[in-house]
């Protein structure tokens, strides 16, 4: 049975909150990998984008970057084989955060070594000395933070960056000789990620989410919600039909987004913790579970 229009809109709001991190992560990936390899601040898929200075007020890729660590980022696609990340020995804080396609922190690499970042179902052999790290989604965002004491310390950070390696397992086992493929630049993929997502129609948004869920499976904890949302065709591989939304859908969609901005900001504030003059976001940050409004 098709639910009535009011029930549909309640589900649409729930589904939007649920899928927003997935769709926004994909838009961020599309922008960040939109390069032929020559653009500052971007790199093709499975390749490093090493920052050469600290983030400042002009930094726009993500909110609230650190200002005492230099970032080395890479967008990984491990759908066909694991990627090997080699983290060198360093004399300072340097760790790798692995974010999945839903913005959960799947793993943190904080010791020197070679790590094979793999999907749980991958069944190949790893060479000696390579540590397997299972992650839940084919799209992963690796964010490496290397601390520095000031601009005069930058050459030391560059030396660490040069020793980092990222290459497919098949290239690693053949001795590490690897020429990364050249990327491609498309003008239509030059956008501000959050603006791109907010400008999507209902069909664009939910069908993007449905396609992404096929390669970046939802967590087991999401099963109950997805069972409910299947009534409006939101879920891996489904096709969302905007006809469900009834008349005046475009206007109502705009109103819904405006309303969500206010309520989600208030909901997010509930997780804020004060420490003297500092504000930070507490649990379950990084492993959000079913706290979909966080």
Place the predicted regions along the sequence by residue.
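A compositional/structural signature for long, glycine/proline-rich flexible linkers
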Residues: 2-294
């Amino acid at each position: 049975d098709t639910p009535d229009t009011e029930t549909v809109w309640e589900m649409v709001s729930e589904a939007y909150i649920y899928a927003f991190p997935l769709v926004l992560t994909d838009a961020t990936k599309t922008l960040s990998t939109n390069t032929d390899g020559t653009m500052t601040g971007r790199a093709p898929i499975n390749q490093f984008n090493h920052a050469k200075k600290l983030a400042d007020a002009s930094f726009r890729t993500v909110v609230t970057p650190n200002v005492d660590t230099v970032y080395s980022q890479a967008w990984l696609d491990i759908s066909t084989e694991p990627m090997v990340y080699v983290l060198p020995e360093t004399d300072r804080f340097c760790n790798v955060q692995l974010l999945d396609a839903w913005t959960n922190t799947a793993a943190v690499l904080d010791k020197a070594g070679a790590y094979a970042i793999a999907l749980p179902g991958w069944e190949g052999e790893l060479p000696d000395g390579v540590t397997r790290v299972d992650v839940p989604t084919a799209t992963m965002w690796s964010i490496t933070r290397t601390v520095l004491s000031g601009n005069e310390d930058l050459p030391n950070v560059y030396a660490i960056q040069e020793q980092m390696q990222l290459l497919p397992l098949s290239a690693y086992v053949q001795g590490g000789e690897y020429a990364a493929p050249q990327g491609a630049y498309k003008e239509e993929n030059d956008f501000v990620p959050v603006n791109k997502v907010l400008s999507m129609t209902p069909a664009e948004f939910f069908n993007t989410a449905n396609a992404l869920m096929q390669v970046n499976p939802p967590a087991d904890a999401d099963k109950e919600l997805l069972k409910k949302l299947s009534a409006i065709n939101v879920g891996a591989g489904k096709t969302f039909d905007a006809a469900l939304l009834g008349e005046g859908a475009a206007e109502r969609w705009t109103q819904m987004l405006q309303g969500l901005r206010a309520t989600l900001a208030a909901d997010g504030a509930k997780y804020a913790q004060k420490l003297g003059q500092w504000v930070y976001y507490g649990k379950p940050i990084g492993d959000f579970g079913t706290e979909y409004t966080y």
